């Protein structure tokens, strides 16, 4: 199984990756992308089961990437968790409209993120 971590902040990508490293022992592959366009390239090539997606990014924001995954690519089996500092209800609704499965605000609890990843992957 594959997880894609997408964030334009290198330290946050590393933090998320470190939070999920234990899953690699269970056969999960972690992939990284620094912006929305790169994320879509990885998604098309690797077809991850889970995408952890920052909202505010250059080139293509997380809402647009999520909508592309769900509606243009038709990858309805790909589970998307939006990660963002934008915690207002209007942002949550926009995420739902884009097809996101869950929405977590930053700063996030690494243990909660791990629990969500395990639940999605069924491990």
Predicted regions and their residues:
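Conserved Asp/Asn-Gly motif in the active-site loop of CheY-like receiver
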Residues: 30-37, 92, 110
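Two-component/phosphorelay signaling modules centered on CheY-like receiver
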Residues: 10-31
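C-terminal output helix
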Residues: 108-117
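Acidic, metal-coordinating helix/loop segments flanking the phosphotransfer/catalytic sites
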Residues: 32-50
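The feature encodes the CheY-like receiver
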Residues: 13, 57-59, 76, 88, ...
């Amino acid at each position: 199984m594959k997880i894609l971590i997408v964030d334009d902040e290198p330290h946050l990508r590393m933090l998320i990756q470190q939070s999920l490293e234990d899953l690699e022992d269970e056969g999960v592959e972690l992939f990284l992308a620094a912006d929305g366009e790169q994320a879509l390239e990885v998604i098309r090539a690797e077809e991850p089961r889970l995408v952890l997606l920052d909202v505010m990014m250059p080139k293509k924001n997380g809402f647009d990437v999520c909508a592309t995954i769900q509606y243009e690519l038709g990858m309805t089996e790909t589970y998307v968790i939006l990660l963002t500092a934008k915690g207002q209800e209007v942002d949550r609704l926009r995420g739902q409209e884009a097809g996101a499965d869950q929405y977590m605000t930053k700063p996030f609890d690494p243990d909660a993120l791990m629990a969500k990843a395990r639940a999605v992957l069924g491990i």
